Swiss-Prot record:
This is Small ribosomal subunit protein uS9. The gene is rpsI. It comes from Delftia acidovorans (strain DSM 14801 / SPH-1). NCBIfam families: PRK00132.1. The keyword Ribonucleoprotein applies. It comes from the Bacteria.
Amino acid sequence: MIGDWNNGTGRRKSSVARVFLKKGSGKITVNGKDIQEYFGRETSIMIAKQPLALTSNLEAFDIQVNVHGGGESGQAGATRHGITRALIDYDAALKPVLSQAGFVTRDAREVERKKVGLRSARRAKQFSKR
């Protein structure tokens, strides 16, 4: 599959997206489904397509994405990160534009672990004065 394909791996929260990109008509496939079908929410679709819109390449590439882990928001972010890396692999001249928009940087925020003696990461048990 790698022949004339450019690839990039994107990560966000606990999601990992492997993105394969080649010149084409603008068809985006996520896990074998059309992007509209896979991501139900319009915001998730918009987030995933941001690097293409920024570089005016919405109709220029066919993209195949394999994404797993996490939820819809994390998968959309991982897809955006993967598409960004694949675009840079295709044309390194796009890196400054994508970097300026903040798409090249991996969003390092993760879920904070639950602590012993607390209800969640920071929430303590309810305090009773009497």
